């Protein structure tokens, strides 16, 4: 994975087990933009940060969508947590008939920062077109 386009400093910490309990209330067959649940008067949802294109493998096509777990309060404030929720979608059928969608259980992961060390490419000789 290349990394998510997320400002890690803006995220609040949440325990992974607590996040899994919250996400267990989500209906994994909802459209990814509608994933969420209201628990004890608190609305939880996702801020989508990564969406793949459909990967066509013949009979089946695959797609995954990842969002950051968010808590929305009635006053309009939103708290984003260091939790990523990924929905894996499989579809069969075609544009001309209709698609049948299947959804894997939602994957819940803790987000962390990872430092990538600077890499220096060693000198080498390559062959190119003459100018």
Residue spans of the language-model regions?
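N-terminal domain-onset segments
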Residues: 1-60
